[in-house]
Regions:
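Short loop/turn segments immediately following beta-strands, especially the blade-tip
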Residues: 20-25, 68-73, 114-121, 171-177, ...
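Short loop/turn segments immediately following the C-termini of beta-strands
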Residues: 10, 57-59, 105, 115, ...
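Loop-centered beta-sheet repeat module
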Residues: 158-210
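Beta-rich, blade/repeat-based domains predominating
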Residues: 37-47, 84-95, 131-152, 187-204, ...
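Blade-loop segments of beta-propeller domains
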Residues: 34-93
Length: 274
């Protein structure tokens, strides 16, 4: 079995590197590099379709590149989209690869694209511009949508706005794939929402806040409700920290949260509070 991993290099003149993992000797080896898009900020793969999306830069402008994953993990460049206002901080694809959500941290904007791989074409079909600020004058002078995540059944997209201390809920109509704004949730001032992780059972959602290093637990099956808040730091830690990422294991048994400053990865068991 061949295991291929794609990584993005966040520096000029570098793009995507494909690695092969050898299960026998436990080593990685470089297969190839792709440079259609450079200074990578995020990579995203569609779950049920063979597409890899890469956010980065080209000639000093923001760019999204679309690749088809073909045999043996090779990448075929399909198309791209140039965004002159800035660069993207996060990408999220629908499972079938037909919709792509992109957040632009610097401009306060979230773009939604229709992916037509047969043409190939990446067409922007909707945009949301957010406003707001928070008490942290260095990091929250304006809206900064850091990420967009889709719920497991893909009826809901959640935008984490680090600058405005908000979560924005977008509903997705399944047949037409149209997206509309539903409501917002106000977080604790100064916490800085960063990333979202959904439990695979479709009942629970977890928010990681960058500035306060906390984990919020929500129920959302019937209504949106915050039911718990815990620290993402060990009790013994003293110092500055910026929380980084949060993930739920595929079986739903474990929740992972990483930190920069404390420089660790925390493991929580039984993340679903049942």
């Amino acid at each position: 079995m061949r295991t291929v991993l794609y990584t993005g290099i966040h520096q000029k003149n570098n793009g995507i590197i494909a690695w092969e993992y050898n299960w026998e000797n436990k080593l990685f080896s470089i297969l190839f590099e792709k440079s259609e898009v450079q200074n990578i900020t995020y990579l995203c793969k569609s779950t049920d379709a063979p597409y890899l999306f890469a956010a980065g830069e080209y000639d000093g402008q923001g760019m999204i590149a679309v690749y088809r994953i073909i045999s043996e993990g090779e990448l075929q460049f399909l198309t791209s989209y140039i965004y002159k206002k800035g660069t993207f901080s996060h990408l999220q694809s629908s499972k079938d690869g037909r919709l792509l959500f992109a957040s632009c941290y610097g401009t306060g904007e979230v773009l939604i694209f229709s992916v037509v791989a047969e043409l190939p074409k990446l067409e922007m079909v909707k945009s949301f511009m957010f406003e707001g600020s928070g008490p942290n004058v260095k990091r929250q002078e304006s809206s900064h949508p850091h990420s967009v995540y889709l719920s497991p059944e893909e009826r809901l997209a959640i935008v984490s706005d680090l600058g405005a201390d908000r979560l924005y809920m977008l509903s997705i109509e399944q047949k037409s794939k149209t997206v509309k704004f539903e409501f917002e949730w106000k977080a604790t001032p100064g916490c800085g929402p960063r990333h979202i992780a959904f439990h695979p059972d479709g009942k629970w959602c977890y928010l990681l806040t960058e500035l306060s290093s906390e984990i919020y637990v929500f129920t959302y099956e019937e209504s949106w409700k915050n039911i718990q808040k815990i620290s993402a730091l060990p009790e013994s830690f003293v110092g500055e920290n910026l929380a980084a990422d949060i993930l739920v294991s595929k079986d739903g048994k474990y929740l992972y949260a990483s930190n920069r400053g404390c420089n660790n990865c925390l493991l929580y068991t039984s993340p679903s509070p049942r």
